[in-house]
């Protein structure tokens, strides 16, 4: 109920937005009287697109109706009597509305609760950060709403003027008919005697002169009314076009940009509900003005009067048609983007939505949407309106979907749930470009009929660029292409042009955004971390971040050329760091236990003056995704020790916390935190000796323990034969089963008589292998090499 209490505190525009959420589909009184019950139900646990969850949705509907009926029965007194009737009516209404579509009730209530929470959150953020001052966003939204009010008033004014014109014209036509009747009477005068004819003719002439003078004046008045009305429509359309530009070219483009950055881990793009409400208001006002213009044209055709009006009306009619065309085509958008790294033969989903579908009654004749994959060059040709002859660059299964209208939320959308890219056709690559740098896009297209088929629009929209892969080993480099494109794409670009070079601070922002999203942590990259990355990328020794602010990073430096002295690119190393943190060390990173971004020399400088047993965890330079332990311990040979890096494979066998727990001579986490205080909550519980030795099915369960034999002997010598750490006896080496193949073992369709041979996919794999073979042996990505230590007899050696 706390959510509803907060929602009731909303004021101004936020309160109006909340009120719009309710209506006949879900009355606000139901929300009020069943607030606690509604907020305690598992609405989010139901997948509205999964038919198997329908029974649960039906049960929630039945429970809602029962709760309403119980609430109604408990009402007493005079006021209670009216409320009892009203709640009972709502119970019946909801039962009838959602009985055949209980999923729509779930969708409706989720939509309401989500937007209530959003409005409350925005109101709280606004009040805490800006106080009584209205922030820039609210100010802009206020201006948009004020313009809508102005448009409503001028549209009402032209409606009144049109009615006035129609009434004036109808009276004019009546008088014109009277003039024709008088002319007919002149023809009948010959049948009268001369005296009566003369008398009658004089009266008719006076009447005719008076009437013709009136008709001439009224014709001028009518023409003036028509011109004034057309001029008012011109001004209205100017204001409409300006408002539409703000909404479509500013607000909607900003939403799309947020959606693109969300692909890099940025904050969610936010709800489309406010944008849809604006677009629907635009559609409503545009359609009202279009109908007015058509009625004005009809009046002109009914009573032609020479003048400039016909040309003016033709111009405003063409203008309003252009405006509505731009609105319909621009509001056909991709609400849920397909994955930007798209693997063949893998199911994927996407959702497209028409923001004006409800207002323009497009849903009355549900349109079908088709999805195809096209190349970057085909996308360029499409935007130039060049004929592509329905060309595509691959085959997508389940690529057609009918748009559905959801009454509760007022949304018209098509949900592609089970698409799959069967095959891809690649273009010839340029220079050093690899297959993971080639961009495609999913084209969604449909046809919408508006206003009883008065207008028919062919609509198309392109997804964000996608990189197609055929093997998981290509994922890392494909992600680099997507990251660079999402971060540095410019508005209104030619598909899919991106700058080849960007400033280092720009890349820092993109890396930090991606890092926090992948590791799912609020602990991002610090200034010191960014200095370390700059040193690594630019092969520099400067420790001042400002020294790098004017330096540029090229795409080749980022993920095409190996770092100087290493067999990997900058991105491959950074991606390996994110992967190992995401899979194994999120809590340790969030706790600040992993220093990470320091090199061997920096670790030496940090530890040299610390007590024995002080250690730090840093990311390995020599192995992608490796974490090494550096610690201080004085011995005859050395005082700083570095353990051979552990990788994801090692942490799958034994966790970092347990490995640190095994090494009792590691005492303090740098700078001075007791190890057990930091890591003990992550230790695997140790079995009691009796239970550990107990045989299970005739077998005694072994235990794996981390030891460093070389350090044990060194520390024994240092202790003068009275070793403190001799309880860390060497244990038998535990070696994982060797895997020599680069790719998982998949059935070969060439050798399998029942298999389907796919030439495109086979060529794609061949290109990938060709890329590997082109590289010198020392430049191979370690993730594609045989596992480190595969032929070693022990693990945990020192360096």
From Swiss-Prot:
Pfam families: SH2, STAT_alpha, STAT_bind, STAT_int, STAT_linker
UniProt keywords, alphabetically: Activator, Cytoplasm, DNA-binding, Lactation, Nucleus, Phosphoprotein, SH2 domain, Transcription, Transcription regulation, Ubl conjugation
Main location: cytoplasm
Domain SH2 as annotated: residue spans: 589-686
InterPro entries: p53-like_TF_DNA-bd_sf, SH2, SH2_dom_sf, STAT, STAT5_CCD, STAT5a/5b_DBD, STAT_linker, STAT_N_sf
Keyword Transmembrane helix: no
SUPFAM superfamilies linked: p53-like transcription factors (SSF49417), SH2 domain (SSF55550), STAT (SSF47655), Transcription factor STAT-4 N-domain (SSF48092)
Modified residues (Phosphotyrosine): 90, 682, 699
SMART domains: SH2 (SM00252), STAT_int (SM00964)
Source organism superkingdom: Eukaryota
Span list, region Disordered: 778-799
Modified-residue entries (Phosphoserine), positions: 128, 785
One GO term of the biological process aspect: regulation of steroid metabolic process
Post-translational modification: ISGylated. Tyrosine phosphorylated in response to KITLG/SCF, IL2, IL3, IL7, IL15, CSF2/GMCSF, GH1, PRL, EPO and THPO. Activated KIT promotes phosphorylation on tyrosine residues and subsequent translocation to the nucleus. Tyrosine phosphorylated in response to constitutively activated FGFR1, FGFR2, FGFR3 and FGFR4. Tyrosine phosphorylation is required for DNA-binding activity and dimerization. Serine phosphorylation is also required for maximal transcriptional activity.
Location(s) in or outside the cell: Cytoplasm; Nucleus
Alphabetized Gene3D superfamilies for the sequence: EF-hand, SH2 domain, STAT transcription factor, all-alpha domain, STAT transcription factor, DNA-binding domain, STAT transcription factor, N-terminal domain
Family, as annotated: Belongs to the transcription factor STAT family.
UniProt subunit comment: Forms a homodimer or a heterodimer with a related family member. Binds NR3C1. Interacts with NCOA1 and SOCS7. Interacts with ERBB4. Interacts with EBF4. Interacts with CD69.
Role: Carries out a dual function: signal transduction and activation of transcription. Mediates cellular responses to the cytokine KITLG/SCF and other growth factors. May mediate cellular responses to activated FGFR1, FGFR2, FGFR3 and FGFR4. Binds to the GAS element and activates PRL-induced transcription. Regulates the expression of milk proteins during lactation.
Name of the protein: Signal transducer and activator of transcription 5A
The organism of origin for this protein: Sus scrofa (Pig)
Gene that encodes it: STAT5A
